[in-house]
Amino acid sequence: MTQTPVDYKQTVRTPKTDFPMRANASTREVEIQRFWEEQGIYGRLAQENPGEIFILHDGPPYANGELHVGHALNKILKDIINRYQLLQGRRVRYVPGWDCHGLPIELKVLQDLSQAERSQLTPLDVRTRARDFAQRTVQSQCASYKRFGVWGDWDHPYLTLQPEYEAAQLGVFGKMALKGYIYRGLKPVHWSPSSQTALAEAELEYPTKDDGSPAHTSRSVYVKFPLISIAAPETATVMAAELLPRLSAFHDREEELIDALLGERDDLPEIAVAIWTTTPWTLPGNLAVALNGELDYALVASDEHGLLIVAAELVERLAGTLATRFETIATFRGRELEGSLLAHPLFRRTSPIVLGDHVTTESGTGAVHTAPGHGSEDFELAQRYNLGVLSPVDDYGRFTREADSDRRENLPVFAGKAVLSDGNQAVIEALSAAGALLKEEAYVHKYPYDWRTKKPTIFRATTQWFASVSDFRPQALSAIAQTEWIPASGENRITAMVAGRNDWCISRQRAWGLPIPAFYCENCANVLLTQESVEAVQAAVRVHGSDIWWQKEASELLPPGIACAHCGGTAFRKEKDIMDVWFDSGSSWAGVLGRRPELHYPADVYLEGSDQHRGWFQSSLLTCVATEGTAPYKTVITHGFTLDEHGRKMSKSLGNVVDPKLVIDGGANQKQHPAYGADVLRLWVASVDYTSDQLVGPSVLAQIAEVYRKIRNTARYLLGSLNDFVPERDLVAFDSLGEVDQYLLHRLSVVHLEVTQAFESYQFSRFFQTIQNFCVADLSNFYLDISKDRLYISAEVSLRRRSCQTVLYRVLESLTRLIAPVLPHLAEDIWQHLPYPRSDASVFEAGWPVDHSQWFQPLTVDRWPGLIVLRDRVNIALEAARNAKRIGSSLEAKIRLHVEDPALTDELARQKDELRYLFIVSQVELLDELPAEVSVEEGAAVIVLDADGQKCERCWNYSVHVGEDAEHPTLCERCVSALAGAF
């Protein structure tokens, strides 16, 4: 009777799972997001988790334009933190926000209108258009953020245009005003002629070239201010003594020369103080020249330029600049020249010499032209010396008629000319015509531009509203010191900014924003800004929104019977200025954290780009410290900026912009623009050191996608290998596991600890490195490789197989949750494909993995690294034999092995029966001594021989026992035993 052939392939237990090999992210991720939304996973966890409330307060992005990869970096970082906190059992409260007021949106809605059309718009017209634009942008950006996989209260975001938010902001303003921190005054501020409004420091940018060097070029000039008189007689006497031998007109008449220097005669020889400025257009506003009282100044002579006074330290440098040779006649301390009078080169007025610590010898002449209406340091000097303020420039950056007042004869007219173009040229021409121009040259340097119009700004003195930072600066610095800053350098950065900043200009001359709730008496122009008046406006805005300010008259907004405290008048007009948008967003701790149920401040975390040290971090700090005496945050985390793969800024002109939508959903040409999905983008975020600038581009994303693929394939193999495993039935106790199994669980416990520490310390790149190494080195290249024999060949319910499955189960359960904060879609997809029942509908309901401290096995750790290194040596030898065509599969080989390390020799002897599985060969022999022709390299010798015996049809191992079993003549002894359920 002929025996029916057995199909042994059917007895091999290969992995089986319906978890797809390909992610199909563009469709599968959307399905998973729909599942989360339909099941209400985020909302349920946020409400029902047993832990404390965790608040990461969202810094509001601007509701203007499409999202770029920098937005993705920011929101994904926040989501990683929030998802980890949810898995830890905390009740996360994440309210997304948008900054909706301000100039960029106003300009956007006006850009397509003609000047005539713009002039017809009322403030309410502008506001309606701006509001509609902002709300449309919010809807668009909201959808994109959700597609990134970001969880939050998307149905109830905060918008700075919401009436309840605006009312809270007015409350902050009112508290600051009542404490005396808000005032109105004339000061130089950053002014944008292109936008016709004051700007905060955070609304400026400083253009750079691709190499990071400044991209702005100014026309700098060296100018002579003729000396009229010396203030100090002692100085005049010394100067006269040194000058007398050189002046034939005063031969032997020293007393007369002294009198001339003191201004008591009109025959003073031509002496001038030389100044240098990069803003010639500010010279019509000059009211003084500043020296440093502690610097030495030299009176020098040259054939080309006569007698000049410059910093002694700069004489040689200036001689080169002016292409001349200087002879030093006398030197004086700057303080000895204080109060001396100079003639303005263009106007019939004098400019006194004043002293200022800001004057240095780093550049220029050591003498600084001082225009109090065009610089903060100049303004402070003017206050000290009672110089007054002159700023003959209008809102559009053009000279006013005041710029021509007392102008010397035969000089060009300045009025009406733009100070940054033809006005600047006119001043330079006037200096030349007056004989005061020593030199003009181009000067490349940092220069502030309007962040939205991308055009240069100016310093201009105007009447504005200010927050007096100096009044609460010490408290702000103390609050900074009590905050955790990540990276730590952030503390030094914001400390220096707050310590050195001027008062905060909070008013803007536009329509789209929250009004400054001040009124002016029609009779005496006195300002009305009281608790009663602010609360009345606040109440109206809370109900009707800030449009009410433009819809109602002052009398309709103010409480009945209110009167001017100065004159008793009862008629008032409204302030026209609105608040700085940084005051808007800087009040979010009050408008969101202080108003919504279960929210509070200080928040646990603020996280934004490093530019927000001068922006939102600072404005939030100042408003909160001023009103509450504390910082609004406990921890502040900053990230850098996204650059292309070559470290360049992204721009459409360079064609190097990375569009997150294109990364996620792909392009028309999928080969050129693959649909990577949100998780690959998220994995990139976790892979970089976000505290510095990050590189991203096609090759970077391709590398990240490969890491994602390896993690996914690892998970797929784990799922497939557990297709017949029921944890409640099949789990093997730790003590009953084999040593390699215990070692792998030890490694899992270490990975669990390292990943937890990475998330706790916000060092997400450590997560990336740890998970990548675990999936590749520990699992794919080691444990999963050596476990295939047990999983495929052994009897289904054997201890050998169930032990391995127990480890895979533990790994899958932990790994899925460990990756969930960064790769939520992949983690959820794995969870939904678990081959055994789970009570948790979502991986996020399962919580963070439990720390199994009993898995930590130091003894096992000491043994296995040496074995793994030896395994690598064996693999190298096998690969060499394979390349030499001596073997095909490693199972065709027998290994003879000798090591010189006694401890490792003992370990090999102890593990002798398991070595064939460790090396994936058919036989292993340990040699006490080596043949003479074999040498030891790096402490070991590996000899590759042909395996003994015949190839088993079922497991493909070679064995001398193949054919011994009559029922299964083509099988080895292991497979015969496995089919009988005994191996």
Swiss-Prot record:
Highest taxon listed in the record's lineage: Bacteria
Cofactor binding remark: Binds 1 zinc ion per subunit.
InterPro entries from the UniProt entry: aa-tRNA-synth_I_CS, aa-tRNA-synth_Ia, Anticodon_Ile_BEm, Ile-tRNA-ligase, Ile-tRNA-ligase_type1, Ile-tRNA_ligase, M/V/L/I-tRNA-synth_anticd-bd, Rossmann-like_a/b/a_fold
The protein's Enzyme Commission number: 6.1.1.5
Broad EC category: ligase
GO molecular function, a single term: tRNA binding
Entry annotated with the keyword Lipoprotein: no
Listed NCBIfam families: ileS
Ranges spanned by the short sequence motif 'KMSKS' region, renumbered to the chain: 649-653
SUPFAM superfamilies listed in its UniProt record: Anticodon-binding domain of a subclass of class I aminoacyl-tRNA synthetases, Nucleotidylyl transferase, ValRS/IleRS/LeuRS editing domain
Binding site for Zn(2+): 952, 955, 972, 975
Family as reported in the entry's similarity comment: Belongs to the class-I aminoacyl-tRNA synthetase family. IleS type 1 subfamily.
Quaternary structure and interacting proteins, as annotated: Monomer.
Manganese keyword on record: no
Chain sites annotated for binding ATP: 652
The protein, known as: Isoleucine--tRNA ligase
Domain notes: IleRS has two distinct active sites: one for aminoacylation and one for editing. The misactivated valine is translocated from the active site to the editing site, which sterically excludes the correctly activated isoleucine. The single editing site contains two valyl binding pockets, one specific for each substrate (Val-AMP or Val-tRNA(Ile)).
Function: Catalyzes the attachment of isoleucine to tRNA(Ile). As IleRS can inadvertently accommodate and process structurally similar amino acids such as valine, to avoid such errors it has two additional distinct tRNA(Ile)-dependent editing activities. One activity is designated as 'pretransfer' editing and involves the hydrolysis of activated Val-AMP. The other activity is designated 'posttransfer' editing and involves deacylation of mischarged Val-tRNA(Ile).
UniProt-listed GO biological process terms: isoleucyl-tRNA aminoacylation; translation
Residues the entry annotates as binding L-isoleucyl-5'-AMP: 608
Gene source species: Gloeobacter violaceus (strain ATCC 29082 / PCC 7421)
GO terms under cellular component: cytoplasm
Keyword line: Aminoacyl-tRNA synthetase, ATP-binding, Cytoplasm, Ligase, Metal-binding, Nucleotide-binding, Protein biosynthesis, Zinc
Cofactor dependence: Zn(2+)
Short sequence motif named 'HIGH' region, residue ranges: 61-71
Catalytic activity: tRNA(Ile) + L-isoleucine + ATP = L-isoleucyl-tRNA(Ile) + AMP + diphosphate
PANTHER family, per the entry: ISOLEUCINE--TRNA LIGASE, MITOCHONDRIAL (PTHR42765:SF1), SOLEUCYL-TRNA SYNTHETASE (PTHR42765)
